[in-house]
Amino acid sequence: MQIYVNGEETRVPEGINMAGLIEMLELTGHRIAVEVNQELVPRSGFAEQHLKEADQVEIIHAVGGG
């Protein structure tokens, strides 16, 4: 199925959840924030957040500094 990740069309397996997408994008263990269709998804909800055709996903990487 087709979704959008940070504005780019991305093909993913039907029924994938957010945890699967994070793994597919090799972001497991990274400090990120995720939004689906303009709704923030807490890290604790990644496994329950199933993606649907044409969902808009935004992934933001936390950058440390000082």
Which residues make up each language-model segment?
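Compact, glycine-rich, soluble single-domain proteins
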Residues: 2-4, 9-53, 58-61
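Short, charged beta-turn/beta-strand-edge "cap" motif at the junction between a beta-strand
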Residues: 63-66
